[in-house]
């Protein structure tokens, strides 16, 4: 059986699909389904552990040399003709073992955690879990052998979790799981030592998403975290915090700035609603309630872990994707929301006064892992969570007359792309993480 695609995205032309599956990056032609480019992360997932071991050995060697030299100096100073001193023999270094996760520890996966295109779509940027790196590829569709060329692999001190690019596409902005934000240049210069990297800004909580926004020609960094916060900081002078956006009660996992209004921020996470903000003015414009709409599609898999389960526990909502679309026929603005591990897509109309009207709920037969939108044609592509068959994708069309989502038959294209995906597994037990956003939710022991 085929492993589902974990992340999918398209370019603005709608001609190419970029996808991740396990430790593979794949690029497909959306007309023929042919594979145009591929990259496989061959770095062992134990690389960071081995690196820790090597660093510990270096420290021990330095300490051993210092102790040996000190012992020799002391012996020379205290040596007397009438007293024979015991020679100081340095003990061999005890090589530290590579740490091995104990029983019950979560498995270590080698997969691509995030994926985004630069604004000019000349570069593809991802995050590898194997060695805590950001990977940058140049894209050349004239290269018929492989359209992807890795130009930089930068290791970070802590595991990155989200990336964005500056407005001019010269810089990658990287958020990590320890609350720090870094920047690196988009170029072919060699990566620098991770110890030389300095954080641009920080949170006291784990970061979940990062975006670069612009207002009147000035750039800002927007960061969302596990502690319900959205921080708006100046860029590049990020030590100047403009303000915080307060309105969420649970973690923030998804930040979206639509092209049709770059002062508008749409945010979602572990709450039962999505927030609409004027991020520059620090105004909460409206909230989109989701509970009644999504409740029929929640299952027992959305309940809290057993140790936190009570009689009053609700099935939990986690936002995995927020998208927007402008109907070219009517100029109406649409908001699309995907909740994690559900078999539906919610579609809303966004009015000029920022009020929201629910247009439709598209129900499908399988849970959806990820969705992306071809802005040029209004075509949605969804990655399906299936355990049999080779039809890993499903296509939907926005009806520009009714603003509803409709399933379209592109089974031949889906099968061609699915066949080109060479990541085979024997059972679902071998799937890499498909649904992990809800793990950001904080739990109380009381």
Curated annotation (Swiss-Prot):
A cellular component annotation (GO) from this entry: nucleus
Protein name, entry field: tRNA (guanine-N(7)-)-methyltransferase non-catalytic subunit TRM82
SUPFAM superfamilies xrefs: WD40 repeat-like (SSF50978)
WD repeat residue numbers: 107-147, 202-243, 247-287
PANTHER family: TRNA (GUANINE-N(7)-)-METHYLTRANSFERASE NON-CATALYTIC SUBUNIT WDR4, WD40 REPEAT PROTEIN 4
Keyword terms: Nucleus, Repeat, tRNA processing, WD repeat
Family: Belongs to the WD repeat TRM82 family.
Quaternary organization: Forms a heterodimer with the catalytic subunit TRM8.
Function statement: Required for the formation of N(7)-methylguanine at position 46 (m7G46) in tRNA. In the complex, it is required to stabilize and induce conformational changes of the catalytic subunit.
Cited SMART domains: WD40
Coiled coil: none
A Pfam family annotated for this UniProt entry: WD40
UniProt region (Disordered), positions on chain: 67-97
Disulfide bridge partners, by residue number: none
Organism: Debaryomyces hansenii (strain ATCC 36239 / CBS 767 / BCRC 21394 / JCM 1990 / NBRC 0083 / IGC 2968) (Yeast)
Gene Ontology terms: biological process: tRNA (guanine-N7)-methylation
